[in-house]
Amino acid sequence: MEEPEDNPYIRDPPLDFEPVDELDAASATRQVETLREAIRFHDYRYYQLADPVISDRAYDQLFERLERLESKFDRSSATSPTQRVGGEPLDELETVEHVAPMRSIESSVEVDDIRDFDTRIQERLAAAGYEGPVRYLCEPKFDGLSVELVYEEGELSRAATRGDGQEGDDVTANVRTIRSVPLTLDGDCPSFLAVRGEIFMPKDAFQEYNRERLERGEEPFSNPRNAAAGTLRQLDPSVTAERPLDCFVFDILDDGGRGFETRMAEHEAVESWGFQVDDHTARVDDIEAAIAFREEMLDGRASLDYEIDGIVIKLDRKDACALLGATARAPRWAYAYKFPARTEETTVRDIVLQVGRTGRLTPVALLDPVEVSGVEVSRATLHNPQQIAELGVGIGDRVTLKRAGDVIPYIEAVVDSEREAHFEFPDRCPVCESPLERDGPLAYCTGGVACPAQLRRAVEHYASRSGLDIEGLGESAVDQLVDAGLVERLPDLYDLSVADVAELDGWGRTSAENLLEELEASTEPPLPAFLSALGIPGVGTTTAADIAREFGTLDAVMDATAEELRAVDGIGPTLGGEIAEFFDSDRNQQVIEQLRKRGVDPEPAETAGDALSGQTFVFTGSLDGLTREEAHELVETSGGTATGSVSGNTDYLVVGDSPGQRKREAANEHGVETLSQSDFESLLESHGIEI
C-alpha cells in the first residue's frame, strides 16, 4: 500500500482539531474522507508491516475524531475503519453460496505420493500437448479457517466460511472487525473480486488471550484453531472485535476477467491490492525443490507466530491448471504435503479432580506416559464435566493426545473404548466434602479457605511472582505448612516461628530463618503486587497496576464502588462488579484486616506515574531478571509507551541478550537511541522509578 500524498494525518499529524460544532457539512465530509484514508494506511503499517509511523496515542485521537465526525454529520459507512468495532448481534448465521467452489486439496505425509503427483501432472500435460514450463508455487498450509472474501467496486461486500465447499456461513460482520482484512482495496483492483484466505489466531496472541481469560475466570481455548473457529462464528461481532484474529489471503477465486498467467502473478497482485500475504510463498522449478521447501518450513515451523501443518504445492501456470481441471472434490493441479502429526495414542488410567484457589474443580486425566513433540505427557486437563461428556471419555479408554504448536497437550478423541470405570462428577468437594455450586459448565467448592486445597493454592498464589514473590514459599513448602497445621488461614504465614518451621522435614534453622526474613520483607509490598496477591478473580498483575494507579491506596480501593471500578481503563462492567463484590465480602475483609494486624501494610501506588510521559520504548532480546511483560509494565506504569516494533516515533530501543537484527537495523534507520539494560535501569532510577 503506497503512502497517501498530501494527507496531513500520515506523519506527525496535527491533533489540535477545531471543534466539531464549528464545521460545516462540506468541511466535515472532506475531513472524514481524509481521516479514513489515513487510518487505513496506519492499519496497514501496524498490522501488516509491524512498522507504525505514528504513536498509539496519536492513532487513537485520529480514530476518535473520525467517530465523532461520522456521528455528528451522519457520515457512517460500512467500509469505514470505525465499523471494525462490531455491529449488532445476530440471531443466527445465514448460509450463502460461494462465488466459486472452495474445494479440498489432496494431501499426504509421504514423499512418494508427492513425486507421484508430479508424475501425473507431467503425463497429463504431455498428453494434452502442453509444452510450457512445469513449475510450482509453494506456500505454507495454514491451520486455521478458510474463508471467501468478496469485493465489489473495491469494497468488502461479503465474507463466508468454507462450509461444504459449495456454501458456507455468512460471517461478514465478524470479518469486518479483523484489522488485516481490508474493507476497501488499493490500486487497480477488479470491479468484482473473490479471494480465498485463512483466518487464524497468532500463537503469541493466543497465549496472551488465554491468560486474560484465566484471569477473568473464563475457560481457556484448547488451541489457536479452536479459538479462531469459535470467534469467527460468534453471533455478536463486538465479541469478535475484542479477540486477536488475523488473516492471510492466498488464492483468487474470481478475478473479474483479469486472466493472470501465473499464480505468482496472482500472489503479487493480491498483495498490491492491500491484502496480507505470507512472505514465505515461493516459486520453484521442480518437485524436488518443492520437497526441499517443505523440509525448510518444517525446520522453521516453531519460529512462526502462526500454526501450519504442511505446505501446499500448486502448479504455477494458470493455462496448465485449466488443462488439468478438477474432480468433484479437489483440483488436479494442487497437493498438500503435510507435516508428521503431533498426535499420539495413550490410555486413560484415572480421572481425578483438582481444586483451584477460587474453588473451581477441574477434572484431569491421568495417562500412560507418552512423548508428544518431544515432551513426555502423563496428564491432560479435561476442563469441565461438559467436555468429558462431549468426548465420551472414561477410565481405561484409548485416546489420541494432541499437541498443536506450543500449547498444552489435550485429549482430541476416544479411539477405542475399553472402559474399566465410568467417571461420575461428584456433588461434593473431594477434598473437604463441602457442597459444590454450579455455574454453567463449571463447578465450584463452597468451602472457601476452610478447604485445604483452596488454602494451598491461595497461599501459593500469594507467594508467587504474580503476588509478593516470597522466595522459599513454593508448592512443597506450602504443602508442608498446611499439612502440619501451621497455616490454616493466609494471615497465619506471619505467625510462623523459626522453631516451628525448622522442625519440618528437610528444613533446618538456617532455611527457616531465611523464610521468615522473606516474610518480613513482604510486609511492605507495592500496592499493585498486594492486589494481585489477593487472588481477586479476573485481576492479574496488569489490572492490579491499573487499579493501584487509579486509587492510590488500599483503603481507597476497598471503598471504591462498582461504578468507580468500571471507569478504570481495561475494566469492564462485569469485572468491576466482581472486584467490588470481593472487597464487600466479610470473609475477604477479615483476611485483609488480619494481615494488617500482623504488620502487612501495602505501600501507596508510586507517584512517578508521568515520569516517562511522551517517551516510547521498544525491547529486543532477553533482559536479566526482568521479563518482557515486566519491562513493559515498568514503562507503562510510569506514563511511557512500550511497543513491539521500532518506528520514527520510538525514543529508545533497549537491547538485551540475543537481540533481534531487524529491530536494531530499524533503530539505525530511524536514528533511535539504543540502551543497554544497565542504561535502561539507570534511566528509570534517575526518574525515581524503582525496579
Swiss-Prot record:
NAD(+) binds at residues 56-60, 104-105, 139, 162, 198, 314, 338. It comes from the Archaea. The keyword Zinc applies. The keyword Lyase does not apply. Zn(2+) binds at residues 429, 432, 445, 451. It catalyses: NAD(+) + (deoxyribonucleotide)n-3'-hydroxyl + 5'-phospho-(deoxyribonucleotide)m = (deoxyribonucleotide)n+m + AMP + beta-nicotinamide D-nucleotide. Its EC number is 6.5.1.2. Keywords: DNA damage, DNA repair, DNA replication, Ligase, Magnesium, Manganese, Metal-binding, NAD, Zinc. GO terms for biological process: DNA repair; DNA replication. GO terms for molecular function: DNA binding; DNA ligase (NAD+) activity; metal ion binding. Its cofactor is Mg(2+); Mn(2+). InterPro entries: BRCT_dom, BRCT_dom_sf, DisA/LigA_HHH, DNA_ligase, DNA_ligase_AS, DNA_ligase_CS, DNAligase_adenylation, DNAligase_N. The active site is at 141 (n6-amp-lysine intermediate). Residues 607-691 form the BRCT domain. It is an enzyme of class 6 (ligase). DNA ligase that catalyzes the formation of phosphodiester linkages between 5'-phosphoryl and 3'-hydroxyl groups in double-stranded DNA using NAD as a coenzyme and as the energy source for the reaction. It is essential for DNA replication and repair of damaged DNA. PANTHER family: CHROMOSOME TRANSMISSION FIDELITY FACTOR 18 (PTHR23389), DNA LIGASE (PTHR23389:SF9). Belongs to the NAD-dependent DNA ligase family. LigA subfamily. This is DNA ligase. It comes from Natronomonas pharaonis (strain ATCC 35678 / DSM 2160 / CIP 103997 / JCM 8858 / NBRC 14720 / NCIMB 2260 / Gabara).
